[in-house]
Amino acid sequence: MKRALLAVVVIGAGLAAWAAVARPRWAHGLFPPKAPRNLLLISLDTLRADRLGSYGYAQAQTPRLDALARSGLRFETATTVVPLTLPAHSSLMTGTFPAWHGVRDNGGFYLDDEHITLAEVLREKGYRTGGFVGAFVLDRRWGIAQGFDRFFDDFDLDKFADAASMDSIQRPGAQVVDQALTWLGAERRVPFFAWVHLYDPHAPYEAPEPFRSRFPRTVQGAYDAEIAATDAEVGRLLDALQADGRLAETLVVVVSDHGEMLGEHGEQTHGFFIYEPATRIPMLMAGPGLAPRAVPDQVRLVDVMPTALALLGIEAPKPVQGMSLLPLARGERMDLIAHSESWYPRYHYGWSELRSVQDGRFKYVRAPRPELYDLERDASESQNRAGDDPARLEALAQALDEIEAKTKGAAAAEGPRPVDPETEERLAALGYVGGSVSRQNLEDRPRGDPKDKIGLYNLLKLAGTASVEGRIDDSIAKVRQALAEDPEIVEAYMLLGNFLKKAKRPDEAIAAYRTALDKDDEHQGALFSLALAYKDKGLLEEARVGFERARSLDPKNGKVLWQLADLLMQKGEPEKAEAVVRDALARKVDEHRFLLKLGESQIEAKQFDAAEKSLRAALEKKPNLDTARFNLGLVYEEKGRIDRAIASYEGELLQNPKAFRAAFNLAKILQKSGRREEATVYFKKAVELQPDFGTGQLYLAKALLDGGDLAGAERWARSGLANKPEPRVAPLGHYVLADVYNRKGRAADANREVAAAKRLPPG
């Protein structure tokens, strides 16, 4: 239960100064006589400030954003906290730095419930709250949905098997805006807070027409086309509010989470370096009481939350670390220091993290070889002045230490946490290594400078792209090349193992995972992957040892407990599997998944009443849980409740249309009930869903034979026998063929099939 919001922060004298922004002035209170009624927060992913017309880019086609900039506040020097989506949005929503909220990367990090979000503050004040996101990295499972009455994420990971990485799982901005407009139109009487996240500027750059054709066929042109398309979606939102009369009473905030390097300093996208192309962001605010103004002062992403709340007449909760920017709206000065960081090089590759501070002109980057830039004279950050201005370097280094000391929270040193089993299972198909970091990468020791490692980083990125494009041998070669240059990258061995596994080279994959463990014998990801590879090879005892070792290192790791329980079921030890499941349930780990696994183990133990109870509890936790209804169907069949079994299998197919086992079991029940034509339909569905399902093909052959389709019966009987059906079912194929040949008058062939059936070993 989240603790009650604490409205204890007093907005300082700067808020009183906000009175001069609007006319007429008011004499009483900190806030304008009529504050905005609603808040529309639009976060534009991966948008560099210098790619908008309002920020001086001549090639931009961003009329709606430029018009918004002219009508309100345009902050010319805004800096993000991290050039990654989830950490930046966690700061946007809480007004705190990553060192406080603990979210420092995408995947494996979670915004814990203890942190108070903008949505929670506004919901407590009576606002309708709706969040609409365009990327899986902002899915609710990462904690970012706190406080939203309606949160549109709903990413089906099974549809993204060809995605290059986790951050490639996205949806078009038009779909996000459609959902937001539907929600906005459903209720007009209650004040609203809508957060609309548009991911389109993020790579891959695949803008829809007519935008794509308006720009050169280059990487830069494709990026600009995405921004133009995003601008049009922003326009749709503003037009809808204008049409129903609510725009005039709405505070509109547009901000980016981070920028894009576009090849500068050797980085193609973002996340690795913290140079200006990745950290300088657009920030616009327009609405009642805000006079148009270009603000040159340094501001930060963490300042958005307290500023928006101040404009709405609401005090910011403790411990917001950002500042209200209302003094700047009046034309006063604020001497703010921006702080940025990237732990991505360290968490993923074992190289040094990067941290920086800047005051609007001078920027200091703490790295193994420190960097100092005069942004006024050297906007491209190409002239490192660290050796030329030691006094300024020392002053900014001290400022960095002070900021980090003041903003650090208990979560800062935790590092990534395990991803839930369901997500991990699906992300593994993307070659994504997440939620597990080498112990060595968390230790404080001298590390490689990312400036020297950008070539290796790009090589590993290209390896991932090659894998997605089906060039798996090329991806393996690239990882091996990277390891030849730097054999200490534990995550590279993990990637190599994943690629080798994808190439169906399990022994080499096992060797790669073992090498990762040689580098770090407590690397949970390597332990887990090695155990899983053993399990896939049928080396169940070796797999059990690996999972037990991983469990001892992290007893709450849901994916380890899940695989261990599943392994014990495979070994025919349902009682031991149930003990693991009950341990997970006692720890409140992924309850719906483990209730399902408990039900499965109880079915194996023929405890059907207990299994029914467990499976129903799993569905209460997650109504759309795959295989839960299938297992209930098994229970009801055993209990002789055929109507309920039929309903359960039908329900499984509605939830998961690819559930071939549910179709098969449903067909068998219908066949036994004399509903041959319906049974035939579901037998066909089962073998269409699983083309090598030999047992299902033999049942289909028998159903077709009973219906008089001799040609179909012969074809499917032969196919079923070729696809290695269950031994107990294999004789059926020969008997179907014998029956077909008898009906055709081919007695010798019929006798041959009967003899073949009798020669089969008993099933």
Model-derived regions, located:
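Structural marker of alpha-solenoid helical repeat scaffolds
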Residues: 485, 519, 553, 587, ...
